Amino acid sequence: MPKQLLLTKQVALTLAILVTAGAAIAQSGRPPPIVKVLRNNKVVPSPGAAFAPKATLLVSPNPACTDGVSYQFKEAEVTLMRGRGPLTPTKLVHRPVEDLTWMNMYRQPGDRIYVFISCKNLIAVSADGKQRSYPQPKQPQPAQPDLRTDAAKGISFSWLLLK
């Protein structure tokens, strides 16, 4: 394969990834909601926190949105990560309060608990209590591979486990 053609394909692939990365924002015309994880009734900060056997998952409106919409989730994926990959299989969570003691025998400082909620599992609740599905990002054509990042498919939080 000629070098120029290979370079063109790489540029096209990079552009496709960049274009789809903003799909969750562009689809709804508003910033996406935010996943928050609470341990001992306190929000886990971005730099991380020590492990806690119970955690609460919340989906909060983006601070840039002031229209009174709140959010719920039907299903979240929780994965214990080490380095760049999963250390344990992903666990599906269907309620806000989750028991994390199953991670005890595997976890160590420096690992991450990765929480992902797909757009298809988000519910927007308006100020008057009406529920509606969160807008779905545009799907790739059936014959094309899905190269979208997690950020284009939903919302996530990464909890760095400290000592």
Q: Language model features by range: what are they?
A:
Residues 71, 106-109:
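Surface-exposed coil/turn segments at beta-strand junctions on protein surfaces, enriched
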Residues 109-124:
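Short, aromatic- and glycine-rich surface loops/edge beta-strands on solvent-exposed regions
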Residues 55-91:
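Extended low-complexity, serine/threonine- and proline-enriched intrinsically disordered segments
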Residues 27-56:
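Short, compositionally biased P/S/T/A/G/V-rich stretches that sit at domain boundaries
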Residues 102-107, 117, 148-149:
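Long, low-complexity, acidic Ser/Pro- and Gly-enriched intrinsically disordered regions
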Residues 93-101:
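Aromatic sugar-binding surface patches on proteins
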Residues 126-163:
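Short beta-strand elements
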Residues 1-31:
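Bacterial Sec-dependent N-terminal signal peptides
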